[in-house]
UniProtKB/Swiss-Prot annotation:
Component of the eukaryotic translation initiation factor 3 (eIF-3) complex. The eIF-3 complex interacts with pix. PROSITE patterns: RRM. The keyword Lipid biosynthesis does not apply. CDD domains: eIF3G (cd12933), RRM_eIF3G_like (cd12408). One of its GO terms (cellular component) is eukaryotic translation initiation factor 3 complex. Disulfide bonds: none annotated. Residues 173-183 have a biased composition (Gly residues). InterPro entries: eIF3_g (IPR017334), eIF3g_N (IPR024675), eIF3G_RRM (IPR034240), Nucleotide-bd_a/b_plait_sf (IPR012677), RBD_domain_sf (IPR035979), RRM_dom (IPR000504). This is Eukaryotic translation initiation factor 3 subunit G-2. It is found in: Cytoplasm. Keywords: Cytoplasm, Initiation factor, Protein biosynthesis, RNA-binding. It comes from Drosophila erecta.
Amino acid sequence: MKAFNTSWADEVEADYVDGLPPSNEYIEGDYKYVTEYKFNDDGKKVKVVRTFKIEKQIVPKAVARRRSWVKFGDSLLDKPGPNSQTTMASEEIFMQFIGSKEFDQTHETQLDPGKNIAKCRICNGEHWSVNCPYKGTSMDSKTMMETKANAAAAAAVSDPSKMGKYVPPFMKDGGGGSGGKNWGRGRDRDDSSAVRISNLSESMTEADLEELVKKIGPHTKMYLAREKNTGLCKGFAYVHFKFRQDAAAAIEVLNGHGYDHLILCVEWSKPQP
């Protein structure tokens, strides 16, 4: 700010020595008028008139006590209330104090719109897939298995050589050879849609086997080979699917798939003599 030069004689005559007349205030009705003088950026003297509306209101005792506190610093000799020289009046801000339970509910409500932002593809949790605690486990493989199964099933169905005509059981692969000699055996035991799953762990159970193949397609029966004495899994099992394309999808998806720290081997079940 530029300095405002005045003569010593003018300041003595005006009864002020800082180059500015003193501020004054007066009350008229419900309004209070405060007149102040200051220098602008160009070094010119300007007059500022502030108008305040006087309102009476009931305040808490704590607020009334704060107004009677002894002021300090540049406001030591000021009257009760704000001084425009040392205090800047701004907008009134209303605050609402709530308890911890209400805060938790409000916080959860604010987070509701963002729930769909992060969704795990492995466990469908509210976090990114890279941070999923089930990453690399059997639960992580389910999504991959479903994707591969759908692709393999679609490829099997779209194969023109397998659509559009009826294939008798005795003419299917593993159905008992050509002609009608083995028709009875093919009808009683149809292994055309059966697969053999090997390299299973000893702790494998029927429930685990069911969980492993149920995402691929419907099946008619399962057989888990067990030791007679210990009851532990021998390491292989047979699954008969309802549709041959589902069996093909199982081979495509599960063969070479890691399960229970082992690599599965899945192939077509060979016809029993």
